[in-house]
Amino acid sequence: MANDERLTLSVDCGGLFLKSCVLDESGTMHSKPSRIETPYPLSPDRFIETIKGISDSLPAAYRATVGMPGMIRHGVVISTPHYMTKSGPRTKIDPELQEQWSGFDMQNALTKKLEMPTRVLNDAEVHGAGIISGSGYEVVITLGTGLGFAIFYGGSLSPHIE
């Protein structure tokens, strides 16, 4: 790897699977894509350990980007309905998990655990940042276990409208 080449650990966290790979700045993959089942029940600590395990299994990266479902503000989890359940999507929210996740600073926790700069955003926002042209209004809708949505204007993420 050239000294000026910056690799990013990219993790897409879904309700059923956690998908990951290492990318360079142009989006070229420097690892085979990885996919593991999302473990449940999934506390913030278990999530962090799972992401650490993913990181350790892939080539070294300079930084990380983690997209996860739910409302995320500046890397802090406001709500992540899939992960607040004991058995996964479309099951009853567990009050104890809800309390653990609500207000959890995932960006700071992952930055410390991975020992690299880490950005944590809503998964639709991460997806959109990778595909928008930067011209005018652009809407990104993602369909997976859940439905994701993001609006960009002039290449910048617009205020949240959940």
Question: Language-model segments: which ranges?
Answer:
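Conserved phosphate-binding loops in N-terminal lobes of ATP-dependent enzymes
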Residues: A2-V76
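Glycine/GP-enriched mid-protein hinge/lid loop-to-helix segment characteristic of carbohydrate kinases
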Residues: N3-L9, C21-E25, S31-K32, P41-R46, ...
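Fold-independent oxyanion-binding glycine-rich loops
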Residues: C13-G14, M68-P69, N122-A124, L143-T145
